From Swiss-Prot:
InterPro entries: FAD/NAD-bd_sf. Pfam families: NAD_binding_8. This is Uncharacterized protein MJ1488. The lineage of its organism: Archaea, Methanobacteriati, Methanobacteriota, Methanomada group, Methanococci.
Amino acid sequence: MRIGIVGAGLGGLLAGALLSKNHEVVVFEKLPFLGGRFTNLKYEGFQLTTGALHMIPHGNDGYLAQALRKAGANVKIINSKPDGTFLINGKEYLYKELFSLLGFKEKAKAFKLATKLKLGKVDKNISFGEFLEEIDLALKVGNAFTGWALSLTAYETPMSEIIEIAKNYHKFGGPGIPIGGCKAVTDELSRIIKKNNGKIIKEYEVKRIEIDEKAYIDDYEFDVVISNISPIETQKICNIKFLKSKPKPSKGIKISIATKEGIIKHGGVLFTPECERINGLNQVTNVDKSLAPEGWHLVMTHQTQLTNNVKKEIDLGLEDIENLFKGKDYKILHIQSYRDDWPVNHASNGTDIDNIVNDRFYLVGDGAKGRGGIEVEGIAMGVLKVVNYINSL
């Protein structure tokens, strides 16, 4: 089949790499670079990113890693050990150690909640915040997790998504860091597409998608079209109206920091439940020193954008950083706000659009993630669903 793909972000490139083995693939990208919000930005010798945090939520074992191997991508992913720690009263705790901070009654409640979640025996129609709200520390920890992983508060996160996330965590484990950062992944996918005689056309803005007896991207004719741009933007340029409900984008702010001393000892996430805004941070140079100049560390913080006053949100994040570093020398490299047409996710978890519109038209990307898929894992889940469906036609 001849397959046209709109958008060369992670979803479009992953779909293209997997499908180009047996099909003729053409990828259209309006920007002068590939990877969308999953590639590197070189700045003062540091490998910053256009969006992601140089981390894959389920490391070398999750859906993205499996899809990369299926595509034949040569990407090395180092699993984080530990997955993460939680900073409470100036001290780091592993998840299981958090229970020691609770009184007897709260500890009993917490164990009960943790067991219910692991077994999936909870009310799926409530929010994660409602599930946790009887225990103050649990709610703070929950907000830190959903803020870092989903760019949502615990109250904005459906319990149905948390149940699926928990299943995936118990199945695959925690995060990992791709050596070379995000760009190592997207560069490898573009290499595979070209090796399989696929085409990638950069700086080309698609004006129209037409689905009829054949599928069209402007004047190009295809058997199948896959859109990796936002579902809302896709519908605007398409003759098919497929959105039954409007997806809700998630907003966030990332701050990249240079430091010689470092702030984290491990390659996982440091969750910050007591911060005013920052939900967590990582120090990827503990695993891959090539992401910073010699003698330096790259630290990246992430926070959910809680209000529409972006300047205030950034200022609160900077205050958190000052408190976290406690007199250590550091330098702010870059502040990035993800909202409007360049959000964290085009559809927040729980509002994703189905991948399959019809036999000629499909959606991938962070507006069409699989259930319980954190960021790029959700993208990979959606891509695998589309690829399997197309290959079964």
